[in-house]
């Protein structure tokens, strides 16, 4: 009868005709396909795994233990912001400070931790934010970016680097003076 407010730390999305889901207190990704459910991927974080006996005991013992694990980053309690592609599984373990985005290469099983964005990319894509999705036709991840934030970031680039378009050619034709700060979010596409 253990009860903890779990918040919204879970993911749901589509991949290859199925629907994937993740849930709190679980580092598996499940694939729903019709009437069946399969474990699609299991992540092992070694010493950062939630102990197998974590849920043994009464609520009055478990709540302080849970708070200790959560507040002191002692375990990966779940995965969130999940995006699945043919080559990658991308997710973010929530509640970690600093946040980290983990890119798991499905072909070789290696992990990349993308916590070193800097400058323009950090401001626009978020230094520790997972992508919002993936376009399988172009092979690009995408992220929704606030128009006012994008305008400000481009203006800063213009002032600090007169050759910024050589470094960021995808900004050609984007004039911050013509951008409406009140417009809908922009979609930025990028590859890993």
Region annotations inferred by a language model:
Residues 25-32, 95-104, 149-162, 183-188:
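Structural motif
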């Amino acid at each position: 009868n253990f009860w903890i407010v779990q918040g919204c730390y879970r993911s749901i999305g589509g991949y290859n005709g199925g629907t994937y889901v993740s849930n709190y207190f679980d580092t598996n990704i499940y694939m729903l396909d019709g009437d069946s459910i399969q474990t699609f991927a299991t992540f092992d974080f070694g010493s950062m795994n939630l102990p197998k006996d974590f849920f043994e005991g009464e609520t009055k013992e478990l709540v302080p233990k849970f708070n200790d694990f959560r507040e002191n980053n002692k375990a990966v309690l779940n995965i969130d912001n999940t995006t699945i592609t043919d080559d990658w599984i991308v997710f973010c373990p929530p509640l970690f400070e600093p946040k980290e985005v983990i890119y798991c290469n499905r072909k070789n099983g290696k992990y990349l931790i993308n916590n070193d964005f800097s400058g323009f990319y950090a401001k626009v894509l978020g230094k520790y934010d997972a992508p919002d999705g993936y376009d399988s036709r172009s092979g690009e991840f995408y992220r929704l970016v606030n128009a006012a934030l994008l305008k400000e970031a481009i203006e800063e680039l213009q002032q600090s680097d007169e050759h910024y378009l050589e470094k960021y050619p995808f900004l050609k034709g984007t004039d911050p003076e013509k951008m409406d700060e009140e417009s809908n979010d922009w979609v930025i596409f990028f590859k890993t």
